[in-house]
Amino acid sequence: MSQATDTDVREDGIIESVSGPVVTARDLDARMNDVVYVGSEGLMGEVIEIEGNITTIQVYEETSGVSPGEPVEGTGSPLSVDLGPGMLDAIYDGVQRPLDVLEEKMGSAFLDRGVDAPGIDLEKTWEFTPEVEEGDEVEAGDIVGTVPETPSIDHKVMVPPDSEGGEVVAIESGNFNVEETVVELDNGEEIQMHQEWPVRQQRPTVEKETPTEPLISGQRVLDGLFPIAKGGTAAIPGPFGSGKTVTQHQLAKWADADIVVYVGCGERGNEMTEVIEDFPELEDPTTGNALMDRTCLIANTSNMPVAARESCVYTGITIAEYFRDMGYDVALMADSTSRWAEAMREISSRLEEMPGEEGYPAYLSARLSEFYERAGYFENINGTEGSVSVIGAVSPPGGDFSEPVTQNTLRIVKTFWALDADLAERRHFPSINWNESYSLYRDQLDPWFEDNVRADWPETRQWAIDTLDEEAELQEIVQLVGKDALPEDQQLTLEIARYLREAWLQQNAFHDVDTFCEPEKTYRIMDAAKTYNDAAFEALDAGVPVEEITDIDAAPRLNRIGVQEDYNEYIDDLEDDIESQLRELY
């Protein structure tokens, strides 16, 4: 977040009352959503309500010690972010202040109030390579040059979306900082490498298109059963300790997006520390470079001011849209949207608004929709295509999925990954309940899997779903009468389903090989279980007792496929052994 520019001189106001993060001021000449600086320390805040000459402000910093009578300075500008080279590999707070720069300024890891810094380094020079020539006509959004921001990502310098465009009269390659002019147009407009954009305003596009390509996560249960599309939306609700954050970390590490924006919204500080420590050491499987080269982190932990939780999700989605405009596929992880909703509830109650269900404000659904609807696969105004995929964790108290945040989120998103405390207690991770989860993208993504993985992907997956569904029904009977009371074919189905659960749905996030599973391997593990199923039922039909079928030496080797680096050879040998050992029984 940059210091707001004084483009519109405004009169200062006087603080009238202070209630936590909510401050009221009188005689302040301001507009809705303007940034203001509150008190003698200049704490950043945002106008959220105006009634007569009384202005209500939510303050993005701790307000202890602020008293009535202190001044409030208006800026005339809405809450905006700096967009330009230098955002990748950066760690921001909820209003885009770079934490490493603030630490240098303060000389301490503990930040004083009222300290500000530009969102991107204004002094650092970048190597600019033109993409257009003098005499070319450019319009709003057009790419005029590139900057090698990291080894993985070329930053594309664009004409601002609100520009009138024109003919290029001056452009040259060289090293420039972000405030220097790199392109001059015939109408006198000068284009720099950075631009500002209000966080609450969606960046313009030509058209929102139907997504047809999956966002490959490397997690078998997600890619195999509940895929999300590039440009899709997903929710991960679950009780405490069920694995929401580790699942989000896995997605941030291995999703095949070009850019990842990770927003830690009101979660534990040590979880953000884990991201900051792990990501620089991890290798991006697509490029071979460090994962941080494609990652932007926004850390707004639980001990930071409540009001900034709202700004951090908008800051994250605006940065994601900026990279989308370059033609990149962006994945945004928000962990957790429940903390943002709780911040809305606190501020709403301080404003004495009429509460809705469980005390949340009546506009909870509208705010969530506003956020998730900025996701999508778009044709950009410069002719490129890009996507923003949004994956939001939800933390319902006690794992109650009927609470308002979960229910309102489910009305908006198209993929639902339900985390289950019972699975987590049984050490089944990722603890995504395959009976409760769903993906509405499954059918529209099937053609991609048929073309790029295997033609029989949908049929094999449907067999796995049917087997797991049948197991869920049989388990209710087993709990009443025991497994031995079932017919032999149903006992065999339970055994096959167990291998599906243990070999295919379970995955070790901390194993070097098993942490990431490509779609081909996901298919082969599923198909190996189906091979065992088909051969086992043939043996059963030939009169072989179920105990002998399940007792073959080859079957337990299914559970070790996930950790095999050279899995194709391993599975080929395993399938041959399964079929030959079962044939020997009859």
Swiss-Prot record:
Annotated localization: Cell membrane
| Keyword Chaperone annotated | no
- Keyword match Nucleotide-binding: yes
Gene Ontology biological process: proton motive force-driven plasma membrane ATP synthesis
- Per the record, the domain of life is Archaea
- Membrane topology field: Peripheral membrane protein
A GO CC annotation recorded here is: plasma membrane
> What EC number(s) would the UniProt record show?
7.1.2.2
Query: Which keywords has UniProt assigned to this entry?
Result: ATP synthesis, ATP-binding, Cell membrane, Hydrogen ion transport, Ion transport, Membrane, Nucleotide-binding, Translocase, Transport
Protein residues bound to ATP: 238-245
Reactions catalysed, as given in the entry: ATP + H2O + 4 H(+)(in) = ADP + phosphate + 5 H(+)(out)
**UniProt feature coiled coil, ranges:** none
Q: What is its main location?
A: membrane
One GO MF term on file is:
proton-transporting ATP synthase activity, rotational mechanism
One Pfam annotation, family name?
ATP-synt_ab
Q: Which InterPro entries did the record assign?
A: ATP-synt_VA_C (IPR055190), ATP-synth_a_Xtn (IPR031686), ATP_synth_asu-like_sf (IPR023366), ATP_synth_asu_arc (IPR005726), ATPase_a/bsu_AS (IPR020003), ATPase_F1/V1/A1_a/bsu_N (IPR004100), ATPase_F1/V1/A1_a/bsu_N_sf (IPR036121), ATPase_F1/V1/A1_a/bsu_nucl-bd (IPR000194)
- Give the family from UniProt: Belongs to the ATPase alpha/beta chains family.
Subunit note: Has multiple subunits with at least A(3), B(3), C, D, E, F, H, I and proteolipid K(x).
Q: What does this protein do?
A: Component of the A-type ATP synthase that produces ATP from ADP in the presence of a proton gradient across the membrane. The A chain is the catalytic subunit.
Protein name stated in the entry: A-type ATP synthase subunit A
The organism's lineage? Answer: Archaea, Methanobacteriati, Methanobacteriota, Stenosarchaea group, Halobacteria
